[in-house]
């Protein structure tokens, strides 16, 4: 945190806690291809948004079944006139919101984001099963 320090560390207490620490289970990965590649691109007009919802089951009954989340990664290909006009928000089944990409007023690039990974840890510990929502918003620069 840039505003607050963390004080002095009690090395003895830290060592005692470390000896009792329970480790996490091995890393598991569960992948969903939400929008098949053969679907036509979606057009989002300035000032509007596109909402993509999908259901995840956490790879239930598979060797890589998940019961809680550590991080989520969304990989997208997006073409736009102004990249800075885009905002991406992911909403979990528990209604936690995570902004994956904020509006950026100084980003006027039109270079596409091709297979671009957006990662978040805001859903840490949540159950992955249920309805997920990805909102892609496009603001209208002229309305600033």
Located regions from the model:
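Beta-strand-rich interaction surfaces with strong enrichment in secreted/lumenal proteins
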Residues: 40-42, 121-124
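Aromatic sugar-binding surface patches on proteins
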Residues: 108-119
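Secreted peptidase-domain scaffold signal
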Residues: 2, 7-86, 144
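Short beta-strand-plus-loop segments that form exposed binding edges in beta-rich domains
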Residues: 135-143
């Amino acid at each position: 945190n840039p505003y607050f320090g963390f004080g002095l560390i009690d090395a003895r207490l830290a060592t005692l806690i470390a000896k009792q620490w329970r480790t996490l289970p091995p890393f598991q990965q569960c992948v969903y291809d939400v929008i098949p590649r053969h679907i036509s691109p979606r057009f989002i007009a300035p000032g509007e948004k596109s909402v993509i919802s999908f259901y995840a089951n956490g790879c239930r009954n598979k060797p890589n079944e998940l019961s809680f989340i550590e991080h989520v990664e969304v990989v997208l290909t997006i073409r736009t006139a102004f990249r800075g006009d885009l905002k991406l928000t992911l909403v979990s089944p528990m209604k936690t919101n995570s902004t994956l990409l904020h509006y950026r007023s100084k980003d006027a690039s039109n270079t596409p984001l091709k297979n671009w990974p957006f990662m978040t840890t805001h859903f840490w510990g949540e159950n992955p099963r249920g309805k997920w929502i990805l909102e892609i918003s496009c603001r209208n620069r002229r309305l600033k």
